[in-house]
Amino acid sequence: MPVLVLLRHGQSQWNLENRFTGWVDVDLTAEGEAQARKGGELIKAAGINLDEAFTSVQTRAIRTGNLALDAAGQSFVPVTKDWRLNERHYGGLTGLNKAETAQKHGEEQVTIWRRSYDIPPPPLAPGGEYDFGKDRRYAGKDLPDTESLKTTLTRVLPYWETAIAPKLKAGETILVAAHGNSLRAIVKHLFDVPDDKIVHVEIPTGNPLVIDLDADLKPTGARYLDAARAQPLPAVG
């Protein structure tokens, strides 16, 4: 039966600095690299043989996937990159320190932007420091200027349905190395998590989440490979 392994990228430099990262291409810290390797070691220890991997076009996710595959002894596994697996676009909050933003706009407003399901932050102004339309990896793409978790899911799911789900339905074991919110979108879809509950689902960095699926891609079981760093999971069935 198909198996899906979700792996959130290891700690990035802006995670460490408590900044809204979103689509900014920030690299892993040394700790983040270690988390990615540990994730791969856990995959190897669990005896999971991957058939294919998917990741975003952001360096922190790409490197997490590569480091994990190498540590798992499976660096030969083909990897497909697509921008639709990117992190949520934080719009006008991009690059800002989270604590300073709360002081400026109020804790309640920032919490709404971060944790509501369908309320996005203010849009990113065009032509500024973080104008992703200038980045050639997004050439010809219709890009958002901000996203809520709801619109992140709207972006992720078509790619899931056309690229990843068919591989799983063929019985493959798939790794998706991506980001907290793009992975949260997949979890919401698979487990049918209510809108008001998904914003509270946390996915820890560098800890492989293994989801066993039936032929219809309904979860039959789910577990984190590092139990000591696990977070609560949605109910199966």
UniProtKB/Swiss-Prot annotation:
Family: Belongs to the phosphoglycerate mutase family. BPG-dependent PGAM subfamily.
One annotated GO molecular function: phosphoglycerate mutase activity
Keyword annotations of the record: Gluconeogenesis, Glycolysis, Isomerase
A Pfam family matched in the record: His_Phos_1
Source superkingdom: Bacteria
Record field: catalytic activity: (2R)-2-phosphoglycerate = (2R)-3-phosphoglycerate
SMART domains recorded: PGAM
Assembly information from the UniProt record: Homodimer.
This enzyme's EC code(s): 5.4.2.11
Record function comment: Catalyzes the interconversion of 2-phosphoglycerate and 3-phosphoglycerate.
Disulfide pattern: none
Enzyme class: isomerase
Pathway: Carbohydrate degradation; glycolysis; pyruvate from D-glyceraldehyde 3-phosphate: step 3/5
Record protein name field: 2,3-bisphosphoglycerate-dependent phosphoglycerate mutase
